[in-house]
Amino acid sequence: MAFPPSAGFTWISKTHNDTYPTITAAKCKQHGRAVFVTGASKGIGRVTAVAFAQAGAPSLALGARSSLDAAETAVLDAAKSAGHPPPQVLKLTLDVADEQSVADAAARVERAFGRLDILVNNAGRVEKWVPLAETDPKSWWATWEVNLKGTYLMTRAMLPLLLKGGEKTIVNMNSIGAHLTRPGASAYQTGKLAMLRLTQFTCVEYAAQGVLAFAIHPGAVDTELASNLPEDTKAKLVDSPELCADTIVWLTQEKQSWLAGRYLSANWDVAELMARKEEILQGDKLKVKLVL
């Protein structure tokens, strides 16, 4: 898939389309962690929850608007196959764009786990891609409601629980689209760009209390959300959901405070990313800002 250099796809020279030995979730350690994954009923969200179970996370909250029964079964099976005790699974009917729904979820997580270590804001929406004058205002804004407002509401409600936890880590599901201006994608791509700034604000305001937030492009994954994408784009969705899921589990098994507020891509080889840590820190790279 060809992207302009400014999109950063090949900024790390070695890229992946599927999971690889370095990041395999079953080799990672998430013992003792309480994890919340939104949009967990299917797609990347469900696979991410499964990956945390494979890594031994004992407490998993799964949030979605649709049934989570299949996701719960997959999580329990994954933990068993990896040789871990069955995790405590909290299934939450959740609309991330609804303040009361999010507040209710936070209350249930607190009752069940007492705190939260890792929040994965995965729930998302993609509108039908058409030029601005042809957009439906309700559909256009609904994308922002889920992708940005949903991330804001979840972060806002879960921060008190994260501050009680050990890892205090937030992973926001982003997109390479934040760095693109594809005709027709005005709601999705502007919302993802705004999410990057929200990720930075989270760190600016809470890093002193130990909170870490970063955003990640999951790769080009063929999920249910992709149904509204143009056909030429759908044909390029060749990455596995396991690539992103395992990358997230690997990146959060040890606290990577230097990633605070930054944009990452699941396609990037993590060994090369880590090798460029000093370059990233010295240049304050992988953040949204005006370069003059």
Swiss-Prot record:
Enzyme kind, highest EC tier: oxidoreductase
Q: What's the short name of a Pfam family annotated to this entry? A: adh_short
SUPFAM superfamilies in the record, alphabetically?
NAD(P)-binding Rossmann-fold domains (SSF51735)
Q: What is its EC number?
A: 1.1.1.-
Annotated knockout phenotype: Leads to complete absence of citrinin production.
The record, for InterPro entries, names: NAD(P)-bd_dom_sf, SDR_fam
What is the protein name stated in its UniProt record? Short chain dehydrogenase citE
Organism for this UniProt entry: Monascus ruber (Mold)
Gene name as annotated: citE
